[in-house]
Amino acid sequence: MEFSSHHIRLLQQLDEQRRRDLFCDCHIIVEGQMFKAHRNVLFASSGYFKMLLSQSCRDMGEPITATFDVFSADTFTAILDFVYSGKLPLSGQNVIEVMSAASYLQMTDVIGVCKMFIKSSLDINEKDRDGFFSLSDKDTDSNGSGLYAAGWRTESSPTHTHKTTEHGSFIAGYNYPPPISSRLQHPFSKSPRKPELVRKHRRRLLPEALTPALSHIPLGDLVGGSTECMLHDEETVESVSQEEERTQTQVSIISIKVEDLDATSNSWPESPPQESLDQGSALHITKAEELYKAMPTILGGVSGWGEDELSSGRFKCPFCTHTVKRKADLKRHLRCHTGERPYPCEACGKRFTRLEHLRNHFQTIHEAGKLICRRCKLPVTKVTGRVIQDGTRRYRLCQACLAEAGLDNVNFDYGEDQPLVLPPENEREHCWNFKEEGRQENGSEAAESDLVIQEVVDSEEDELKQKQD
């Protein structure tokens, strides 16, 4: 026979012992505040304490002291109350801190409860909201006060979190508009738009050219009635009911027109004409998924046109929250986590994650360090070239250019740090001119000597011929 209340009484007794400081053999210090607990309870409820206490199980006679600086004292108080009572006091202010501390202490149950609390607090579905908006006037007059009291609150009510019994979702910190009964007290208030009409207006917009029957309907009537309604005390309920009936009739007309136009949407052009886009008094565009039906898919996923949520054409990194549109970008991003560097440099062996990084490295490091002759622009090395200092400038010349300058007979035994110093500019110009003039004179003398020799040879041959004759 099992007693379901036994573990509850056991936890209550252990909690009473903790509060009275009885048999507490574990002290936890958080922000200078000491918390006393039993090591058996902490061992059974936390993976971190299980690992910590199993290493010090030999010292059973003395109490164990542990210090934490990763969370606050209030956060640890909430976790310790959960360990001894099974009740976790969560709120919108401490849920993130409690989940972070539970993750550090390896308490999976607390993490799951925090995730459920966050999801239920922030996830207010449109279906639940439509449940309030779709109430008829009859239901509102009969039992509308009880429903609105549970789910709706005015702007003056304090911010709190509670759970509705009918819809099963938390409503936290949201100022919804008051019900119809409270709007009737303000005759000059604006009537809100119906969410179903807003949704149809956002997802199914009709072109003006294909809906001549709807062109005479004002835009304000399509999205929820007139802009301002003057409500009197006697005709209030009747005007509201008539307005809702007229709105529902117009919604049915719109849905019928949309269904008729879906069959002919394949023959429409890829983009609507510019004239229909410029007119703002009517609805111009059809459903986006039909209008852009002929567009190609991107990497197996079609991006959602006109959707508020994240499109299915994106790729999410499994290690972080980064999302990309292309699979190649995701593959390149994963190298940040895996450490893969598939592009090595052939000159120095350094590896890179991206090809453009390798190109930039090669251009700035290796190609920028090439030795080039200043005069002929040919590549040189430390053996075939020499550093020349011209005043404050230093550059390198090859052996051919040094020979042209008349510096080929200079001794190059001293080091690279000591450059060859050129003579002053006037002497250097005279040297260059002298070499050029000497080269020209030598060429002219050689030409004249060749001519003289040729003439001598010709005269000797003529004399020999004359003698033979």
From Swiss-Prot:
Function: May be involved in transcriptional regulation.
Zinc fingers typed C2H2-type, residue spans: 315-337, 343-366
Compartment(s) where it occurs, according to its Swiss-Prot or TrEMBL record: Nucleus
The keyword Phosphoprotein is annotated on this UniProt entry: yes
SMART domains membership: BTB, ZnF_C2H2
Cysteines engaged in disulfide bonds, as pairs: none
GO CC annotations on file: nucleus
Keyword set, alphabetical order: DNA-binding, Metal-binding, Nucleus, Phosphoprotein, Repeat, Transcription, Transcription regulation, Zinc, Zinc-finger
Database matches in Pfam families: BTB (PF00651), zf-C2H2 (PF00096)
Predominant localisation class: nucleus
Organism this protein belongs to: Xenopus laevis
Domain BTB: 24-92
Protein encoded by which gene: zbtb8a.1-b
Protein name: Zinc finger and BTB domain-containing protein 8A.1-B
A Gene Ontology biological process term: regulation of transcription by RNA polymerase II
PROSITE patterns for this protein: BTB (PS50097), ZINC_FINGER_C2H2_1 (PS00028), ZINC_FINGER_C2H2_2 (PS50157)
InterPro entries linked: BTB/POZ_dom, SKP1/BTB/POZ_sf, Znf_C2H2_sf, Znf_C2H2_type, ZnFinger_BTB_dom_contain
MF (Gene Ontology): DNA-binding transcription factor activity, RNA polymerase II-specific; RNA polymerase II cis-regulatory region sequence-specific DNA binding; zinc ion binding
